[in-house]
Amino acid sequence: MAVICFAIAAFAQDGPPSINGPILGFVADGTGATIQPIIGVLGASVVGRPLAFDSEIHNAVVSPKQNFALATRGENAEVVLIRLAVDSVTTTSLDAVAAGADLIAISPSGTAAATYTHNNKVVRFITRLAQVPETAFQFDASDIPGRLQRLAISDDGALALLNFRSGDDSTLWVVSSIGSRWVLPVQRPSAASFLMGRHDAVIADDAAQEVFVMRGIDQEASRISVASFGDGFDGIADVAASADGLRIFITTKKSETVTIVDLQATLSTALACHCVSTGLHPLKGTSVFRLSDPSNGAVAVLDASSSEPRIIVVPVMTARTVSNSKGGEQQ
């Protein structure tokens, strides 16, 4: 509790909030208009107040490494890079990236990103995020029917996954940085993400009620089934993989559980999170994911870093918590 109270006291000072003490990660709200720190460590943390910026931001997405975020700012929706360093939060305009991004995706290692604009249906691949970010490639998707629902990009910035929906139909496209594109054999894709450092992807198919890993999607791809309807999945919300690609994590739309599939041991474990899952959002640590948003109350976090995965409930800082922290009381 000492860790939490130390950090809460820092956020209780007058003026813009600063980042002090250990941070488990950051939370962007549903519209990406706010970014809140998760102060503390696993098992002893709290969701802090939103960080203050000079102007409003939108569409914010936090890097899996929790060291930066991408967002849009201003009337022209310029793309900005927000560095989330200890005691320093800086915002920089990315002049090399066209304004107007409606969707932003960051790769599993945070080395590449992609943006998409609905009105002209242009996808932009962004690389060199750790140095001077630049637009490495842009793709015109105006001849692809439907509206883009989800976007993912590989760590090397070479491939992007585009999930388009038109009525009841969905298609999952692969676009490469050399301009080629093709459709993956998925009936009704609902979620897809790349594995770290690879051109492999974990994909959810709602029509087939299946989650599978597709290896080498830019070559002669092979398909490995991970979970199917018989395993109890219905309406898949999100999928993710561990850093080594040996475990797959699945959340669904209709149940308050998260499922962990060990590909080596061919074992499946379901944990009740008692939450409305908004996805699998990486936090600091090995296989640690945020499952829900502060807008729905306390935040559920999956800690799968050990042999016995657990669900941790992280409270949200309130005015009373801040007031009590000034008085030195522990919550």
Task: Please describe what each predicted stretch is.
Residues 124-212:
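Solenoidal tandem-repeat scaffolds enriched in leucines and small polar residues
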